[in-house]
A protein has these predicted regions:
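Phosphate-binding and hydrolysis-coupling loops of NTP-dependent motor/remodeling domains
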Residues: 2-31, 470, 500-533
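A residue-identity detector for tryptophan
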Residues: 31, 41-42, 68, 133, ...
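N-terminal start-of-chain detector that recognizes signal peptides
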Residues: 50-54, 78-81, 105-107, 304-309, ...
């Protein structure tokens, strides 16, 4: 197809080129240009779709068939690769529409906040009579509320979700481990005081750990030593502990309560852990956990703070509070707009915490099934998770989600531009390889880097093609007494040559909306993507329309 003799099949005709040249020279203002630009059956020079690339690969086969994927393959997860503006989000929209219509719990993570995707998900959820949740960091006034650290299977998950957002390279790893222990002690103390973990509550407790510890000490004394107040009034701290309390800058009443508990021979790991924190000089200790405060400051500032640290007792706030268990029980559709263009760090922190929350819930579903804790049996549900630009959201939380959540019915589809983006974000080629090894289906649109293209081409076998070689020869006769003056001959030699089935160049020249796909165990397909048709009678609420404007 790409041989010079086939240029007439690939290149536009002279009449087509003349029409485009006329439009450029006349600025498209005369009546001829208005006719040549019309996309109609009677116009032989109608402009071609602005998809770019080299369409000849798709045109080799003139008979198109619909490509179907076995739904059983979905739990093997899928990756979609393609450079910017070649159709990733529209492909995401198409697959999401199918998942919603099929009845799957459908969750879409959209870091950049695509208005068309959000609108399409709302419309499809209404057509299917399904609940729709919209969480959007860029529009907190319209968004539902969600506490990323409020639900967990084990109390240690809270500290992990927060500490994982901190730097872990070099010496930062030691500080991150220290922050993890500090937050874990705070969280266990809050649980003992029946305080639900949230970013706001964690920040408040971290900034005033003396008060939190004092409240916990009092609760323990009330529970195990009723009437302790009289003994406490007559209790004097050992002189060494009193001097230490003054030196460290800690609250004297809290330090006295801790010393009083010690005198009562009340041993408990959490009390010892709080005592260890309080025994450190306040300013020195705050330096050790200094990396925690900027993160919490960002997560608890402005309108976003009320969004991700919801006050469950505020009855004046009409925005519903979302949690993943409620989403799955109601078979809902969820759009997550993380507004990463405004604040990438907050977007990553919330997105990663959501992935960790989903992974934790997957573990409970895997063990106990859906509807755990409810009367009656709940049917097993499929949960379709779509993560657009997932390289911005990737973290350690994502690896177990891909590794093990398939058994809980999770089927994940991720979208990114290059695989190097994933390696750069997660900071480890080995971990990036773990992620790639759990993505069994691959769809590759136009890409710009050879390394990304080779992720597909290296999985393909080489093929043999027939080659034809024309040989022509002529020569003088070697014997002078021969009656022949010269000899000549012509041959067509047919042979077989081994070549790659596809080269990286084929993938860097794809038109928009076209892709190669490896599905169902590495079967290769060349595909052209459909677009969902818009319904003119779609009713969109005013706030959705305002956000999409």
């Amino acid at each position: 197809v790409r041989q010079p003799e086939n240029d007439g099949l690939r290149n536009p005709s002279k009449l087509y080129k003349a029409a485009r040249k006329h439009e450029i020279e006349t600025m498209g203002t005369d009546w001829i240009s208005r006719i040549t630009r019309k996309s109609a059956w009677w116009n032989p020079v109608a402009p071609l779709p602005p998809v770019g690339g080299s369409p000849e690969l798709h045109g080799i086969e003139i008979e198109e068939d619909d490509i179907w994927e076995d739904l059983g393959e979905r739990v093997g997860h899928k990756v979609v690769l393609g450079t910017t503006r070649v159709g990733k989000t529209r492909l995401c929209e198409t697959m999401i529409v199918q998942d919603i219509r099929r009845g799957d719990v459908t969750i879409a993570f959209d870091p950049k906040g695509d208005a068309d995707l959000m609108t399409r998900m709302y419309v499809e959820s209404q057509k299917s009579n399904r609940p729709f949740y919209m969480f959007h960091l860029g529009f907190p006034e319209y968004s539902c509320r969600y506490n990323p650290i409020g639900d967990y299977g084990r109390i240690t998950e809270v500290a992990t979700r927060i500490a994982n957002q901190l730097p872990s390279e070099g010496q930062s790893a030691a500080f991150r481990d220290f922050v993890w222990r500090f937050v874990n002690v705070l969280t266990k103390t809050m649980e003992g005081l029946s305080i639900k973990p949230s970013y706001e509550n964690i920040y408040k407790s971290a900034a005033n750990v003396d008060e939190l510890a004092g409240d916990y000490f009092k609760k323990i004394l009330d529970k195990h030593h009723p009437g302790w107040e009289k003994d406490f009034d007559n209790f004097d701290m050992p002189e060494s502990e009193a001097k230490s309390a003054v030196k460290t800058g800690r609250n004297l009443d809290t330090m006295k309560l801790g010393s009083f508990l010690k005198a009562k021979k009340h041993n408990e790991p959490l009390i010892d852990a709080l005592g260890g924190i309080l025994s450190n000089d306040r300013s020195y200790f705050e330096k050790l956990v200094s990396s925690l405060y900027p993160l919490l400051e960002k997560l608890t500032t402005g309108e976003v703070a009320k969004l991700i640290s919801p006050d469950t007792e505020d009855l004046s706030d009409p925005r519903i509070i979302m949690d993943w268990r409620k989403v799955m029980e109601s078979n809902a559709v969820v759009y997550i707009g993380l507004d990463s263009l405004s604040d990438a760090e907050v977007a990553a922190a919330v997105g990663n915490a959501m992935f960790a929350d989903l992974t934790s819930l997957a573990g409970q579903i895997y063990k106990f099934g859906h509807g755990v804790g409810q009367s009656g049996k709940t049917q097993k549900r499929k949960v379709s998770i779509h993560a657009d630009e997932f390289n911005e959201l990737i973290g350690d939380e994502f690896i177990p989600l891909l590794n093990k959540a398939g058994g809980a019915g999770y089927q994940v589809t991720v979208y990114t531009q290059t695989w190097k983006d994933v390696e750069a974000k997660i900071g480890s080629p080995a971990k990036a390889g773990q992620i790639g090894g759990n993505l069994n289906t691959m769809i590759m649109l136009r890409v710009k880097t050879v390394e990304t293209a080779e992720m597909l081409t290296n999985q393909l076998p080489e093929v043999k093609i027939m080659t034809s070689t024309l040989v022509s020869r002529a020569g003088d006769v070697a014997f002078p007494d021969s009656h022949e003056d010269f000899s000549s001959g012509n041959e067509d030699r047919i042979g077989a040559e081994t070549v790659p089935m596809l080269t990286p160049a084929d993938l860097t020249q794809l038109p928009k909306g076209q892709a190669f796909a490896l599905i169902e165990g590495g079967q290769l397909y060349k595909i052209r993507l459909p677009l969902p048709k818009k319904d003119k009678q779609e009713e969109i609420p005013a706030h959705i329309g305002e956000m999409a404007a």
